[in-house]
From Swiss-Prot:
Annotated catalysed reactions: N(6)-dimethylallyladenosine(37) in tRNA + (sulfur carrier)-SH + AH2 + 2 S-adenosyl-L-methionine = 2-methylsulfanyl-N(6)-dimethylallyladenosine(37) in tRNA + (sulfur carrier)-H + 5'-deoxyadenosine + L-methionine + A + S-adenosyl-L-homocysteine + 2 H(+)
Residues bound to [4Fe-4S] cluster 2: 157, 161, 164
Cofactors (names): [4Fe-4S] cluster
The protein's name: tRNA-2-methylthio-N(6)-dimethylallyladenosine synthase
Gene Ontology molecular-function annotations: 4 iron, 4 sulfur cluster binding; metal ion binding; N6-isopentenyladenosine methylthiotransferase activity
A Pfam family per the record: UPF0004
Species of origin: Pseudomonas syringae pv. tomato (strain ATCC BAA-871 / DC3000)
Length: 442
């Protein structure tokens, strides 16, 4: 009987991509098949996120639930990867001594040999080093699961924002070679993928070397991906405003495969807070980039990230953030209360804002963002949207669902499953808080 792998993923799209590659790797090297039940697994793998304190606490809560499984089956291997593993290293075993393997985002390619070593020696295996992009040289061809796929184009971040743990857990920026990325995209397209999302912690900082020694930026990469046969839609995330270049804006204008949607995190609308965060740009510079982009691509949807309650945030700072949200006309966005991360400069700043006030500000900010997002959805009613059909509706098996260019889920009645993986024109009939309803055009 085939051995089973249970994998749980916390956090960002980079982690989702890494988890999919670990499934490919362990399937090829150890013939492990994925199971939906941890109690049936021979190997349990937890891919972790450390971006906020709550995410880190969740790791140890989950490991605690698996302790009984390990006691009942000592042959089971429990492996912890991702950013918490990178940050904590062997210290994970101080709180969870039954963990067998600890590995970082840059050492996931060593996972098969680490699992084997843990089984043979009965000793813990820990490797959270940063061998740059070596892992991509050791991964099998990606398995295809649906019409959309992530492709990692670079690793790490060198911006060192004062609140962010990423440079310490994933290392500094390293770009994959240009042709390696295109090879992966071509493989995906040959196996039915129609939409790719190019990933990086600072993806618009991509600088990949081509086969002839040139250095290509993200705009060059997007143009090359767009001509891969079968790829009809391109997204990318996550961007830093500092490197949102004119060449990238021009790519948005020139490349029809590049969606009319951009996620461009700003974090705050206060120049004082942006300086404390070491974002290295002002709100005026950010808005200038948006104006230039909207002039090049009228109607483009823009979402962002916001941190509420950063140390020292005053009522005026928060009001400036709310004003930026309104001025910029942001679509649905992500927002969180600031969470100090050990080892980051901001963790040493005095934080004297009451928690209740932080929650009040977050609620007000989210309410405003949701209002604006819903208004954009309402404006889409009556329009015809080209959507990529991805699956059956989660609530009604008689319906299919897909996504618009501006990343909205559309549910529509259809009894033709062959439409999954294809593009379809759908008339938008109704806007709901988190999705749209439509009718398939024949």
């Amino acid at each position: 009987m085939a051995k089973k792998l249970y994998i749980e993923t916390h956090g960002c799209q980079m982690n989702e991509y890494d988890s999919s590659r670990m499934v490919d790797l362990l399937g090829e090297h150890q013939a492990l098949e994925v199971t939906a039940r941890a109690e049936d697994a021979d190997v349990i793998l937890l891919n972790t996120c450390s971006i906020r304190e709550r995410a880190q606490d969740r790791v140890y809560s989950q490991l605690g639930r698996w302790r009984e499984l390990k006691l009942a089956n000592p042959e089971m291997v429990i492996a912890v990867g991702g950013c918490v593993a990178s940050q904590e290293g062997a210290a994970i075993r101080d709180r969870a001594p039954y963990v067998d393997v600890v590995f970082g985002p840059q050492t996931l390619h060593r996972l098969p040999e680490m699992i084997d070593a843990a089984r043979i020696t009965r000793l813990p295996q820990v490797d959270v080093s940063f061998p740059e992009i070596e892992k991509f040289d050791h991964l099998p061809e990606p398995r295809v699961d649906g019409p959309s796929a992530y492709v990692s184009v670079m690793e790490g971040c060198s911006k060192y924002c004062t609140f962010c743990v990423v440079p310490y857990t994933r290392g500094e920026e390293v770009s994959r070679p240009f042709d390696d990325v295109l090879t992966e995209v071509t493989h995906l397209a040959e196996h039915g993928v129609r939409e790719v999302t190019l990933l990086g912690q600072n993806v618009n900082g991509y600088r990949g070397t081509t086969h002839d020694g040139r250095v290509a930026d993200l705009a060059d990469l997007i143009r090359a991906v767009a001509v891969v046969d079968g790829i009809d839609r391109i997204r990318y995330t996550t961007s830093h405003p500092l490197e949102f270049s004119d060449s990238l804006i021009q790519a948005h204008a020139d490349v029809p495969e590049l969606v009319k949607h951009l996620h461009l995190p700003v974090q705050s609308g206060s120049d004082r807070i942006l300086a404390a965060m070491k974002r290295n740009h002002t709100t005026l510079e950010y808005k200038s980039r948006l104006r230039k982009l909207r002039a090049a691509v009228p109607g483009i949807s823009i979402s962002s990230d916001f941190i509420v309650g950063f140390p020292g945030e005053t009522e005026k700072d928060f009001d400036n953030t709310m004003k930026l949200i309104e001025d910029a006309g942001f679509d649905f966005s992500f927002s969180f209360i600031y969470s100090p991360r050990p080892g980051t400069p901001a963790a040493d700043l005095k934080d004297d804002t009451p928690e209740a006030l932080k929650k009040e500000r977050l609620a007000a900010l989210q309410h405003r963002l949701n209002q604006q997002g819903f208004e954009i959805s309402r404006q889409m009613v009556g329009s015809i949207q080209r959507i990529l059909v991805t699956d059956y509706s989660k609530k009604d098996p008689g319906e299919l669902q897909g996504r618009t260019e501006n990343n909205r889920i559309v549910n529509f009645r259809c009894d033709n499953p062959r439409l999954i993986g294809q593009f379809a024109d759908v008339h938008i009939d109704d806007a709901q808080p988190h999705s749209l309803r439509g009718s398939l055009l024949q």
